């Protein structure tokens, strides 16, 4: 819940940057998971949820524009 509030304060450009960072993080976590080195599997779900929230906000801001 706190993260969506943090994301809502950002503009479209910052959200796009945040989305790229989250996608990179998701890729790294998936690689760790595939190699069996992932110590905190809950992070995959958290990152996926954050990606969905950022994409929703980008779409929302696009519709308002």
From Swiss-Prot:
Q: Which residues cross the membrane?
A: none
Keywords for the protein's UniProt record, in alphabetical order? Ribonucleoprotein, Ribosomal protein
- Answer whether the UniProt record assigns the keyword Cytoplasm to this protein: no
Identify one Pfam family in the record: Ribosomal_L29
GO CC terms on record?
Answer: cytosolic large ribosomal subunit
Tell me the Gene Ontology biological-process terms attached to this UniProt entry: translation
Statement: the UniProt record of this protein carries the keyword Ribonucleoprotein: yes
State the Gene Ontology terms under molecular function.
structural constituent of ribosome
HAMAP family, per the entry: Ribosomal_uL29
| UniProt similarity note | Belongs to the universal ribosomal protein uL29 family.
Q: What is this protein called?
A: Large ribosomal subunit protein uL29
**Organism in which the protein naturally occurs:** Buchnera aphidicola subsp. Schizaphis graminum (strain Sg)
């Amino acid at each position: 819940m706190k993260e969506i509030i943090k994301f809502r304060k950002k503009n479209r450009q910052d959200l796009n940057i945040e989305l790229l960072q989250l996608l990179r993080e998701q890729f790294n976590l998936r690689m760790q998971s595939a190699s069996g080195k992932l110590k905190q599997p809950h992070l995959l779900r958290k990152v996926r949820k954050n990606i969905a929230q950022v994409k929703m906000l980008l779409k929302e801001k696009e519709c308002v524009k």
